[in-house]
Amino acid sequence: MISQTSTPVIVCGAAGKMGREVIKTVANASDMTLLGAIECQPEYIGQDIGELIGSGPLEVPILNDLQGILVMAAQEKQPAVMVDFTHPDSVYENVRSAIAYGVRPVVGTTGLSQEQIQDLAEFAEKASIGTLIIPNFSIGMVLLQQAAIAASKHFDHVEIIELHHNQKADAPSGTAIKTAQMLSELGKTYNVPNVEETEKIEGARGCLAEEGIRIHSVRLPGLIAHQEVIFGGPGQIYTLRHDTTDRSCYMPGVLLAIRKVQSLTKLIYGLEKIL
């Protein structure tokens, strides 16, 4: 059994780049204990997750059995947390299963539809289980979004460019969608056209998000995660940019989310809501 003062943590997507970083962080946190490492890639199954991340044995085998780990978690005296960095195709069922077993989900996987998020919110509230869906765990990105909100009061034209590694499955990124949503909630319409635009190639102007905001997605090897919010006005351009140079920048936000979700009784969307 895990110490009554230590939070049991399950990591889904444990062998992925973000999953490995989360494993290292949880293993080094004095108030957390790694309960399970879930991965669907067959070449990793059965390995000790500590050996995989290069930190030495942690005595936690990599499994492809979330259900079994959730059953174990439900038996712990201290409420468990599941951190999910998997794939848009699997995250919804993972989160529903965790809530059903009383395990608090912290979700970094993007690609959930608004309908899925709403369904999970209703399910979590009915079960009184804290759930966090966070498109971006970087404190710097939260500051960028806050600066964008401030700038939007003075500019009527804005576009978002998000750039990620070419292994990212969804586009646009959850962070870009979240940024556009935050700007759209300010009660104004952006980018009112001065001319009738024609796209010679479909998608050349990016995707049209809420309130006229356009989002452009770039996928290239060599990138990690980057975002620009570009405002334009007569005689000036104002550019906000955040660059992730190492995934370790997300870990303070992940730790905060794991600790915070335990006191919640409903779903919350966005890191800025718990800072």
Curated annotation (Swiss-Prot):
(S)-2,3,4,5-tetrahydrodipicolinate binds at residues 165, 174-175. Its EC number is 1.17.1.8. GO terms for molecular function: 4-hydroxy-tetrahydrodipicolinate reductase; NAD binding; NADP binding; oxidoreductase activity, acting on CH or CH2 groups, NAD or NADP as acceptor. Pfam families: DapB_C, DapB_N. It catalyses: (S)-2,3,4,5-tetrahydrodipicolinate + NAD(+) + H2O = (2S,4S)-4-hydroxy-2,3,4,5-tetrahydrodipicolinate + NADH + H(+); (S)-2,3,4,5-tetrahydrodipicolinate + NADP(+) + H2O = (2S,4S)-4-hydroxy-2,3,4,5-tetrahydrodipicolinate + NADPH + H(+). GO terms for cellular component: cytosol. Keywords: Amino-acid biosynthesis, Cytoplasm, Diaminopimelate biosynthesis, Lysine biosynthesis, NAD, NADP, Oxidoreductase. NAD(+) binds at residues 13-18, 108-110. CDD domains: DHDPR_N. The active site is at 164 (proton donor/acceptor), 168 (proton donor). Pathway: Amino-acid biosynthesis; L-lysine biosynthesis via DAP pathway; (S)-tetrahydrodipicolinate from L-aspartate: step 4/4. The keyword Oxidoreductase applies. InterPro entries: DapB_C (IPR022663), DapB_N (IPR000846), DapB_N_CS (IPR022664), DHDPR_bac (IPR023940), NAD(P)-bd_dom_sf (IPR036291). It is found in: Cytoplasm. Its main location: cytoplasm. GO terms for biological process: diaminopimelate biosynthetic process; lysine biosynthetic process via diaminopimelate. The keyword Oxidoreductase applies. SUPFAM superfamilies: Glyceraldehyde-3-phosphate dehydrogenase-like, C-terminal domain (SSF55347), NAD(P)-binding Rossmann-fold domains (SSF51735). NCBIfam families: dapB (TIGR00036). Catalyzes the conversion of 4-hydroxy-tetrahydrodipicolinate (HTPA) to tetrahydrodipicolinate. HAMAP family: DapB. Belongs to the DapB family. This is 4-hydroxy-tetrahydrodipicolinate reductase.
